[in-house]
């Protein structure tokens, strides 16, 4: 018995030297022994090294673009709006730096009470229709390769009323991410027409404002960050259905609207409105010259109809301006996927060249300005102009060039069709 005890005492872990009695388990193999404590320590070391290697590989292969690179990418697709591009570039860069810091902290389990916690900063965009708000957000998502969803605030209602729940916004993001929850939790959600959900009145009412203040209240939690329960099929929730849990803490929300009438609120606050001999007179030219949205303060937005809690969750404000004629002409011609290049490509498939006179492009821009549709209305104008030609061209093998001049845009004449024989003569005389 004594010999057996001595032999048990002689069995020791080959790594830490502890005897069999000092550990829970001692595993033997090939003349060596290892205890359960050393096995656990080895597992921790291996896991830490694997996580470190994975994080390093991700950083090397998936570097976050710098603000200057983000802005340069936006320049390729979006004309003008330099101030908005700068603000958005910095905001998006800081947001995804924060996301990566949170992921790194979670992976390495280094959450410390002394470590500074970075709060999420969502974005509010102010600007007229057709100025590029939606396109800026779409282009950002394409650059960052993250899921992107667009929601219309006017279709939302408070939970329990006819209309869409705010959770349906998150469902759209999940669908854009092919129901990959981890990927969706790093996405971007663009909520348009948010000015339409302003409070109907500052005065309390006996009727509930389910599509105004009620929607703002419902949006608060998902803007700030919460774990939302999403019905996979959409629609209203009911107790006997499965839900997908989605954490909105790292989802970037870009909330936008035209905010028509906000400029009057800002001007009143700045003291530009008054009565009597001391009142300051302003002309339309003065109003056009000054971008009053740049001077917007939270108190102006509250007076417009947004609740203070909602404004507080949108600390970054970017303003976009109306596009003038020169900017709209650039929108037509300069971006990689400009409308002129797209239609030229369509005509090229029928072996026909499409040409625009400079005056024709200016006339198209003027029409968009007159209609008040901005860049968004350019495609409709181009369609109206080119559909009759695109109808005839496939049946006309003799046409070499379609030339658009100002008179054609104004509807004073048909677009000019140049035949192959005429083109050959022009080239000979040239």
Swiss-Prot record:
Coiled coil: none
Binding locations of ATP: 128-135
Keywords: ATP-binding, Chaperone, Metal-binding, Nucleotide-binding, Zinc
Record field: transmembrane: none
Domain ClpX-type ZB: 1-54
GO MF assignments: ATP binding; ATP hydrolysis activity; ATP-dependent protein folding chaperone; protein dimerization activity; unfolded protein binding; zinc ion binding
GO cellular component: HslUV protease complex
One BP term from GO: cell division
Pfam families named in the record: AAA_2, ClpB_D2-small, zf-C4_ClpX
Binding site for Zn(2+): 13, 16, 35, 38
InterPro entries (alphabetical): AAA+_ATPase, ATP-dep_Clp_protease_ClpX, ATPase_AAA_core, Clp_ATPase_C, Clp_protease_ATP-bd_su_ClpX, ClpX_bact, P-loop_NTPase, Znf_CppX_C4
Entry similarity comment: Belongs to the ClpX chaperone family.
Assembly: Component of the ClpX-ClpP complex. Forms a hexameric ring that, in the presence of ATP, binds to fourteen ClpP subunits assembled into a disk-like structure with a central cavity, resembling the structure of eukaryotic proteasomes.
Biological role stated in the UniProt entry: ATP-dependent specificity component of the Clp protease. It directs the protease to specific substrates. Can perform chaperone functions in the absence of ClpP.
Name of the molecule in the record: ATP-dependent Clp protease ATP-binding subunit ClpX
Organism: Corynebacterium diphtheriae (strain ATCC 700971 / NCTC 13129 / Biotype gravis)
Gene: clpX
């Amino acid at each position: 018995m004594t010999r057996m005890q001595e032999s048990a005492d002689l069995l020791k872990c080959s790594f830490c030297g502890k005897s069999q009695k000092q550990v829970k388990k001692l595993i033997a193999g090939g003349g060596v022994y290892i205890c359960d404590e050393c096995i656990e320590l080895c597992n921790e070391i291996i896991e830490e090294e694997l996580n470190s290697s994975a994080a390093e590989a991700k950083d090397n292969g998936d570097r976050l673009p710098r603000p200057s690179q983000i802005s340069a990418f936006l320049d390729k697709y979006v004309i003008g709006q330099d101030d908005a591009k700068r603000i958005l570039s910095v905001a998006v860069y800081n947001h995804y730096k924060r996301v990566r810091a949170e992921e790194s902290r979670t992976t390495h389990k280094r959450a410390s009470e002394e470590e500074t916690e970075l709060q999420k900063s969502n974005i509010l965009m102010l600007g007229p229709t057709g100025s590029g708000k939606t396109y800026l957000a779409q282009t950002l998502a394409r650059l960052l390769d993250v899921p992107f969803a667009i929601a219309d605030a006017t279709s939302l209602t408070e939970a329990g009323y006819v209309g869409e729940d705010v959770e349906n916004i998150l469902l759209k993001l999940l669908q854009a991410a092919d129901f990959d929850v981890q990927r969706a939790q790093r996405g971007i959600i663009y909520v348009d027409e948010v000015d339409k959900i302003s409070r109907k009145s500052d005065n309390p009412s006996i009727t509930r404002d389910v599509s105004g203040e009620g929607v703002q209240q419902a949006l608060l939690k998902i803007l700030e960050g919460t774990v939302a329960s999403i019905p996979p099929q959409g629609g209203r929730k009911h107790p006997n259905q499965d839900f997908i849990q989605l954490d909105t803490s790292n989802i970037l929300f870009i909330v936008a609207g035209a905010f028509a009438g906000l400029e009057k609120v800002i001007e009143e606050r700045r003291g530009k409105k008054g009565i009597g001999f001391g009142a300051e007179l302003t002309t339309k030219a003065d109003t056009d010259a000054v971008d009053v949205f740049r001077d917007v303060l939270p108190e102006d937005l509250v007076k417009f109809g947004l609740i203070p809690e909602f404004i507080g969750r949108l600390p970054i404000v970017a303003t976009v301006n109306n596009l003038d004629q020169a900017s709209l002409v650039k929108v037509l011609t300069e971006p990689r996927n400009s409308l002129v290049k797209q239609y030229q490509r369509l005509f090229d498939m029928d072996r026909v060249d499409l040409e625009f006179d400079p005056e024709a492009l200016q006339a198209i821009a003027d029409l968009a300005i007159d209609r008040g549709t901005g860049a968004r209305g350019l495609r409709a104008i181009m369609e109206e102009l080119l559909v009759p030609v695109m109808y005839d061209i496939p049946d006309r093998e003799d046409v070499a060039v379609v030339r658009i001049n100002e008179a054609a845009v104004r509807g004073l004449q048909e677009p000019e069709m140049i035949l192959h024989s005429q083109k050959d003569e022009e080239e000979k005389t040239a």
